[in-house]
Amino acid sequence: MLYDNLAVNEQGHLTVGGLDTVALAEEFGAPLYVLDEDKLRENCRTYVQALRENMPEGSYPLFAGKALCFKGLYPVLNEEGMGADVVSPGEIYTALAGGFPAEKLYFHGNNKTDEDIAYAMDSHVGCFIVDNHQELARLDEAAGVRGIRQRVLLRVTPGIDPHTLQAINTGRIDCQFGVPIETGQAARFVADALSRKNLIVEGFHSHIGSQIFEAEPFCDAVDILLDFAQAMRQAHGFVAETLNLGGGFGVRYLESDPVVDIPGNIRALAEHLRQGCAEKDYPVPKVLLEPGRSIVANAGLTLYRVGGIKTIEGYRSYVTVNGGMTDNPRYALYKAPYTVVPASRMNDARDLSCTVAGRCCESGDLIQENIQLPEMQRDDLLAVLTTGAYNFTMASNYNRLCRPALVMVHHGRARLAVRRQTFADLVACDL
């Protein structure tokens, strides 16, 4: 099995967290998002412990809410010692509704509106990650009106290419996020920020990309950031207390993907940071990381019912399911790989070479192509593994399809965390 929280029971059914997925689909319906809370907590603890043991005091992980965001998630994150990265008022509202402390929220975004800024400040969000000069001016003004000094980190781009998908590569110079170091613009960005009397500049933020399997790209980013920090100390006497290195550690979607050693990578990163600071006689800053995918992806799976099975002679066979790009658009967007298994027939020989297609009126609505399954029958159950990240949050109502329910599994019990949408929900905002 791809992950240790998955198994096959005596009936030949896939289990997650010890629960039969066939029984889950019968109780809660399908399509169905399933999130293993025990696996989620284990992933949180891996990051919290690794940062606590290897980085300076005050270092901790911030969960990237863009990967998965619903109210019931945030109490778990808070209990496990996580902070949270939020990118919209909606994510802020969801986190606060889940009882998450506002001071542990870090607000991202390359185009925060005046309304966004006002809502975040009035909600007492702890820190803003500032993307550009215009935002600096607006934050300074908004903080002044409220009589506060707002904590900020400055997002800079180090010009790193971690060799990941172009769509998720965010560290290169030509990118809509942050201010580039190499062009000299980041130096002017820092000077501007330090001149703002209502802002407290705590340090720098960078994000180099996603699906990174080793520490080296992060170490390269640290080298560039430390050189930049040293230059800013010499120019302004400013010493960065915090380096936020963003997210990016990858997960296994296929058996062929490498295993990612999160503690080992963090340990290597910490050693590299300490060495770099020692060489420059620079105080070692606390480190924040922003894992999203690597916290929730392998804790989640999606269950589908098989509908039609169609073989086009001389070409291929299609197995259609009762979901698709509306609940997982990632294959349609960029051919994202997933492992698909016959959840109700795990022990059957997989002799059928096929493509799994969704139900949308769209030729690109595919889940995976050219995979092996048993000869499928209508109402068989399929499971797509490692869907905890960027499925629920990227879901849509295309073709006016209702979004699936989300169930959390914990200590051998399942509970409904997000109900399935109804037709009434689809027209609730229509006038």
Model-inferred region functions:
Residues M1-R151, A187, A191, S195-I200, ...:
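A charged N-terminal "starter" segment
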Residues Y3, G159-G308, L373, L401, ...:
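Active-site loop/helix belt of alpha/beta enzymes
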Residues Y60-L62, G81-G83, A102-Y106, C127, ...:
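Structural preference for beta-strand elements that scaffold enzyme active sites
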Residues A67-C69, G90-E91, N111-T113, N132-Q134, ...:
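Active-site-proximal loop/turn and secondary-structure-junction residues that shape catalytic pockets
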Residues L73-Y74, A97, I117-D122, L139-A142, ...:
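Short acidic, glycine/serine/threonine-rich loops at helix termini
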Residues H108, D131, H207, G246, ...:
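Conserved residues at the C-terminal ends of beta-strands
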Residues A268, R274-C277, Y282-L431:
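Charged (often Lys/Glu-rich) extended helix/loop segments that serve as interaction or gating elements
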